[in-house]
Amino acid sequence: QGHPDLKCPGVEFCGGSLGIGLSYSIGNALAARIDGKDHRIYTIIGDGESDEGQVWEAAMTAAKYKIDNMTVFLDRNFIQQDSYTEKIMPLDEELLGDDLSEMWKDASRWKTGDKWRSFGWNVIEIDGHRIEQISDAIRRANQTKGLPSIIIARTIKGKGVEHMEDNPQWHGKAPKPEIVPIIEDELESQFMIAPSIIAGDMSNLEKEVKQCVAGRADYIHLDVMDGQFVPNKTFDHTKIKELRPLTLIPFDAHLMIDEPVKHVSNYIDAGSDIITVHAEVCDESTFGEICDMLHSNEVGIGLAINPDTELPQWCYKFVELLDQVIIMSVVPGKSGQKFIESTHEKTRRIAKDLKEHKFEGYIEADGGVNLENIGACFEDGARAFVGGSAIIGQSDVRMIIKEFRNQVLESRRRLLIKKAHD
């Protein structure tokens, strides 16, 4: 069964691919209004049925009757029954070739949101793989009065499963039961490539962000240095706020600053998706304050340690809240350093320790990561990889990100084969 089924808890109606689900939901929302009920209707539609007229008739109806007790999700993964939507009937713009890399994350090329706005809808566009963005979008939609709301969630179909990811051939198909355990292992070992833009042209960081977009980076790593905690100085929250409209790629803000508790709110307001502070400038009390601020604002929580620092004992009180732990493999604040080899053993030890304490986030390897050592970093337990001059400093950023990803995939295949034999 390729479509949501009534056997799935919470699903009350299955519209299939004919686009009638939105009309059904509007009927429910109007009935709730007539009956004086305050419940809310949630509807998920795909981009395939958004090529059809039924959806747009319903869109006009929802705007006419100001249906604000309904939230619609558009799963914008660019794939429909026959191929990519942008090749069959473009919702954004026509796709030439098969490479969606740039269009997927380049906000300047998106037209779908404008179409819904022209029909009188409140439109919220998000990265559909960030639970924090989903939660925040639902809250904003629920607060909107007098307009129907749609959350356009940019997603990658089959994300994390190598043979399914961004593959139209897997539309409406379920995997065979015998390969499900492998798929589960793949999902448990998803990874992210995070280029650090300070390795590029500091006078034109907009260009560096666009290179990351074109290369289909998973995160954009933002190294904030204040000249006090580390000797160098880069940029602050004002620059992050300027860059934020360029893309929905999550901003991974690494604050190498003194007294971060005094400044974190500025980086939240600037649009950071994940904010990491250093254990060296926190104690249990200040980190608790930071956690509260980040958690209440739907921002990922990160803690970083320098090469000569171990995780402090107080951090284990927050371990179930942590989204990421950065283990520095170079001395922060200096560029062009080589990876400190002892970091491999340190990462393996910390990964084991965190797992025993029920850590459900991921470890990020930061500093000197390159094509030669990224596979070993993955095998150590890291799942996010910051690349500075090894990515941004290269002539073809798109190709080098692809090569980074291929190296990790090769290591992951080896681990999966070993586990299967064990």
Q: Which residues fall in each region the model found?
A:
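Conserved thiamine diphosphate
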Residues: 36-39, 86-137
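Catalytic cores of alpha/beta
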Residues: 209, 259-269, 308-322, 367-385
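Hydrophobic faces of well-ordered beta-strands that scaffold small-molecule active sites
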Residues: 191-196, 220-222, 251-255, 273-277, ...
